[in-house]
């Protein structure tokens, strides 16, 4: 009983929560003529607050149709209410293909993420989606 009261007083109350670490998502990659680009490297980057750290990267190659798909990753967790809040996930895309400009998003909230992205890559220099 004393431990429960102490936890409540400090704000560290554990509670169950169902977290989406990575949403189900799909990308269609095309050139500027709206033709599908196959074998483009698509990276779905999962990060979380309160620290803004990258948590994981999932990669896929586009099919001849220019499409790549990602499955959702979810789990039940026990979190504690802390001063900085709970862990909140957000996601970004990085898409690269030799001979085309790299596409990259810099989202910092989940609401900014497009889980049905259609992107056109202009010709140009490609940068790697590998971590800096």
Located regions from the model:
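Beta-strand-rich interaction surfaces with strong enrichment in secreted/lumenal proteins
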Residues: 14-16, 57-61, 81-82, 105-109
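Residue-level preference for beta-strand/loop junctions
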Residues: 21-22, 54, 87-89
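Short, acidic Ser/Thr/Gly-rich low-complexity loop/linker segments typical of extracellular
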Residues: 50-76
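A short, solvent-exposed loop/turn motif at the edges and junctions
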Residues: 76-109
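Short consensus segments that form the blades of beta-propeller domains
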Residues: 16-19, 50-51, 81-85
């Amino acid at each position: 009983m004393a431990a429960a009261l102490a936890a409540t007083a400090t704000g560290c109350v554990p509670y169950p929560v169902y977290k989406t670490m990575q949403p189900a998502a799909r990308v269609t990659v095309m050139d500027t003529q709206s033709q599908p680009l196959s074998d483009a490297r698509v990276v779905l980057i999962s990060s979380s607050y309160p620290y803004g750290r990258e948590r994981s990267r999932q990669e896929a190659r586009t099919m001849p149709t220019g499409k790549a798909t990602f499955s959702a990753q979810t789990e039940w967790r026990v979190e504690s209410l802390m001063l900085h809040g709970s862990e909140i996930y957000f996601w970004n895309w990085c898409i690269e293909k030799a001979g085309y400009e790299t596409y990259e998003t810099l989202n910092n909230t989940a609401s900014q993420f497009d889980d049905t992205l259609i992107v056109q890559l202009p010709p140009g220099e490609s940068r790697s989606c590998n971590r800096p």
